[in-house]
Amino acid sequence: MTVEMTDEENIWGSDNEASTGPQESLEVKKLQQIHSKRGYLDGISSAKEENLQAGFDDTFPLGAKYGFQIGEIVGKLRLFTTLYGNADPQVAADLKQAQDELRINRVLSARHFDEELQPLDSLKVLLSKWQARVLDYEGKYS
């Protein structure tokens, strides 16, 4: 099926048919390439944004859950360090180690999740280790 365009519909056409020399053709082709590329890139960007938003919506609750648990662990260790750090230097050492091991870019890295973004046992082991350590300090200082 061939679609015929009128002169009014042809946005790439010239207003002055007599001036369709080689220079104008190159300019029109270059303009067509620029607009085509821009349209292509806009389409790619739009698709990426939609997929990124969907991924964010799906995984935010999981990230928030782990962020809360990590915040609780580090917060309690910081409290124990403030209250008992002078008498028990191990508390301060544990706080420093926990802050290193539980940094968000380490916890939410690909090594702790499968292809469906479900947590692997390595993440559960890491969090359990620090939760147990906090429980030990709670028992010791309560």
Swiss-Prot record:
Stretch list, region Disordered: 1-24
Similarity remark: Belongs to the YAE1 family.
Biased composition (Acidic residues): 1-10
Gene that produces this protein: YAE1
Ranges for region deca-GX3 motif: 39-79
Protein name: Protein YAE1
Gene Ontology annotations of biological process type: protein maturation
Top-level division of the source organism's lineage: Eukaryota
Main location: cytoplasm
GO cellular component labels: cytoplasm; nucleus
